[in-house]
Amino acid sequence: MLVIHQRLPARSPRWDEELHLTYEARSKSRLRCFAASGEEVGLFLERGQPPLADGDCLEARDGRLVRVVARPERLLHVTCASPLELTRAAYHLGNRHVALQVGDGWLRLLDDYVLKAMLEQLGATVEAIEAPFQPEHGAYGGGHHHSHHGEAEFNYAPRLHQFGVRR
């Protein structure tokens, strides 16, 4: 079994093996899967990190470099007649904590018939496609929780913005 404990800080121009993973699989810190070659792989990554992205590199215990490839999966590709309608669609999806990939004039989310119906009721054009899924990470680290301010275990710093900081 190829055992992987290490995420590399930068992408590498060379690699020895590839892992083709869905978004759900790339979100796990512990995973048993198979490399493109068929070799069994055990991922034991540090918990609390962002999901692996397409092109990320990992180092196996035996020194081999492993490149992550985002496997195509069934998605909903959402477009709208106006930026306002697209913003409304994004708002309603965000209100439901849906993982969302944001592009120039479009949104993508994992296929879900309930969300598809909601988006169509909002006037969006929704097309089912097969593509790699690379959603936004979110503004805060540490995942979803309902902590109280000041509890050290859950007092995560913002990832995208420093609210209230003036320079």
From Swiss-Prot:
- The species is Pseudomonas aeruginosa (strain UCBPP-PA14)
In which domain of life is the source organism classified?
Bacteria
Specify the protein name: Urease accessory protein UreE
* Keywords annotated in UniProt: Chaperone, Cytoplasm, Nickel, Nickel insertion
Q: What is this protein's gene name? A: ureE
Gene Ontology biological-process annotations: protein folding; protein-containing complex assembly; urea metabolic process
Q: Which NCBIfam families match?
A: PRK13261.1-1, PRK13261.1-5
Provide the taxonomic classification: Bacteria, Pseudomonadati, Pseudomonadota, Gammaproteobacteria, Pseudomonadales
Task: Please name the HAMAP family in this protein's record.
Answer: UreE
Q: Which CDD domains does the record match to this protein?
A: UreE (cd00571)
GO cellular component entries: cytoplasm
* KW Cytoplasm (keyword) present: yes
State the similarity comment: Belongs to the UreE family.
**Could you state a single Gene Ontology molecular function term?**
unfolded protein binding
Give the protein's biological function: Involved in urease metallocenter assembly. Binds nickel. Probably functions as a nickel donor during metallocenter assembly.
Q: Which InterPro entries match?
A: UreE, UreE_C_dom, UreE_N, UreE_N_sf
Cytoplasm among keywords: yes
Signal peptide segment: none
